[in-house]
């Protein structure tokens, strides 16, 4: 069972508006109780999510602890799988895609790269996957025009929804102007 999210917890409501985190987790737990079921939380990799992917992994690992499912489950064919997984999913990329990682200013990228180190050991266990994301943050050029387009889109969305980017993601404050 794949559950498509953008963030772990109530932050998810910002991009997946409106969503109720309690309902998402409640439904995930129901599916986890079904036999031969594997739960995967999947997200896109975009300008807002890339700095928070460790929180998703950490949340999934918390469910593994809660369900004591670190060792995996052996199915009827003898294959071992873990009940709870996460996947970084698709990379937002391409001409005109406002939420591509290239729209992230360099100072925010530094903040996000530092976050990857804050989570420590469990990131080292999956080093290759995390290194790809880290390298992407570090090496992709900043696209200032795309950044401006993204911020304009965010501001219009916030005005329409009655939300505010910087209430959830304060690192964007220097770049955010309320309409």
Task: List each model region and its residues.
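Radical SAM/AdoMet-radical enzyme domain recognition
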Residues: 1-90
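Flexible glycine/acidic-rich beta-alpha junction loops that bind and position SAM and/or redox cofactors
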Residues: 45-51, 67-130, 137
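Radical SAM enzyme core and accessory elements
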Residues: 113-179
């Amino acid at each position: 069972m794949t559950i498509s999210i953008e963030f772990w917890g109530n932050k998810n409501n910002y991009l997946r508006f409106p969503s109720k985190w309690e309902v998402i987790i409640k439904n995930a737990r129901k599916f986890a109780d079904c036999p031969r079921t594997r739960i995967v939380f999947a997200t896109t990799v975009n300008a807002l999510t890339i700095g928070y992917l460790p929180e998703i992994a950490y949340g999934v690992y918390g469910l593994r602890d809660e369900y004591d499912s670190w060792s995996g489950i052996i199915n009827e064919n003898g294959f071992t799988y873990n009940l709870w997984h996460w996947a970084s999913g698709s990379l937002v990329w391409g001409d005109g895609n406002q939420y591509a990682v290239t729209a992230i200013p360099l100072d925010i990228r530094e903040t996000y790269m530092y976050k990857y180190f804050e989570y420590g050991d469990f990131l080292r266990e999956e080093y290759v996957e995390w290194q790809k994301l880290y390298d992407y943050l570090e090496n992709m050029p900043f696209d200032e025009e795309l950044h401006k387009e993204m911020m304009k889109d965010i501001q219009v969305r916030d005005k329409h929804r009655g939300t505010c980017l910087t209430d959830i993601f304060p690192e964007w404050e220097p770049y955010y102007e309320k309409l």
